[in-house]
Amino acid sequence: MKAAVVVFPGSNCDRDLAVAFEQAGFDVSMVWHKDSELPEGVDIVGVPGGFSYGDYLRCGAIAAQSPICKAVVAHAERGGYALGVCNGFQILTETGVLPGALLRNAGLKYICKTVDLAVATSDSAFTQGYNAGDVIGVPIAHHDGNYYADDATVQMLKDQDRVAFTYVDNPNGSVADIAGILSENRRVLGMMPHPERAADEGHGGTDGVAMFRALSGLLTDA
């Protein structure tokens, strides 16, 4: 199994995401933002958290125009798997791979803490290691994590069972308490919380491990 983790100027969670993939059995390649192609045979692309390009213009807006993002979009359009975490989620919305946008937190402050997430669906490669309704503890660290989409889009996400996670106690004002969403084919997940920071007992918890193990098991059997 092969994973590629994209690195932008300002990324700061790329190594954490790579380690989480490696611990689940993936062979991981780090891919620079100026590269125009993903490594051959990549099963899943990780778009990590951080502050790509200093969050200028809008979070993820400049990164979405980078050469590697064209390859990431093409990978997703071919049915490839992708995981966008925090800034990675912002980037995936900016590229149009996922609907909606991430706005400034309702409280206008940066938030860094562990929050409770409710697993909204177990019907995806990313969430099949959980049961719908499970509550897991996962860190957040963002200033612009307030998910927004219009009413029709939110209803579509609900009707298609594409809301992956919701906040138990909404920290940032996200519409419908949404913390993470799936693409139409359910092979792309964008989420503001950091599952890679909940993958080591020594770092505060392991509730994110099931996600990476589930991906590993699915792609091994594929």
Swiss-Prot record:
| EC code | 6.3.5.3, 3.5.1.2
Record-linked CDD domains:
GATase1_FGAR_AT
UniProt keyword Nucleotidyltransferase present: no
Subcellular location, principal: cytoplasm
Q: Where is the Glutamine amidotransferase type-1 domain?
A: 3-222
What InterPro entries does the annotation carry?
Class_I_gatase-like, PRibForGlyAmidine_synth_PurQ
What is the active site of this protein?
C86, H194, E196
Taxonomically, the superkingdom here is Bacteria
Q: Which UniProt keywords apply?
A: ATP-binding, Cytoplasm, Glutamine amidotransferase, Hydrolase, Ligase, Nucleotide-binding, Purine biosynthesis
Q: Would the keyword Ribosomal protein turn up in this protein's UniProt record?
A: no
Q: Name one Pfam family in it.
A: GATase_5
Annotated catalysed reactions: N(2)-formyl-N(1)-(5-phospho-beta-D-ribosyl)glycinamide + L-glutamine + ATP + H2O = 2-formamido-N(1)-(5-O-phospho-beta-D-ribosyl)acetamidine + L-glutamate + ADP + phosphate + H(+); L-glutamine + H2O = L-glutamate + NH4(+)
- Pathway linked to the protein: Purine metabolism; IMP biosynthesis via de novo pathway; 5-amino-1-(5-phospho-D-ribosyl)imidazole from N(2)-formyl-N(1)-(5-phospho-D-ribosyl)glycinamide: step 1/2
- One term under GO cellular component: cytoplasm
Query: Which GO molecular function entries does the Swiss-Prot or TrEMBL record give?
Result: ATP binding; glutaminase activity; phosphoribosylformylglycinamidine synthase activity
Give an example GO biological process.
Answer: 'de novo' IMP biosynthetic process
Question: Where is it localised?
Answer: Cytoplasm
What PANTHER family is this protein classified in? Answer: PHOSPHORIBOSYLFORMYLGLYCINAMIDINE SYNTHASE SUBUNIT PURQ
Quaternary state and partners of this protein? Part of the FGAM synthase complex composed of 1 PurL, 1 PurQ and 2 PurS subunits.
> What does the UniProt function comment say about this protein?
Part of the phosphoribosylformylglycinamidine synthase complex involved in the purines biosynthetic pathway. Catalyzes the ATP-dependent conversion of formylglycinamide ribonucleotide (FGAR) and glutamine to yield formylglycinamidine ribonucleotide (FGAM) and glutamate. The FGAM synthase complex is composed of three subunits. PurQ produces an ammonia molecule by converting glutamine to glutamate. PurL transfers the ammonia molecule to FGAR to form FGAM in an ATP-dependent manner.
Q: Which NCBIfam families match?
A: FGAM_synth_I, PRK03619.1
Write down what this protein is called. Phosphoribosylformylglycinamidine synthase subunit PurQ
Species of the source: Ruegeria sp. (strain TM1040)
Name of the encoding gene? purQ
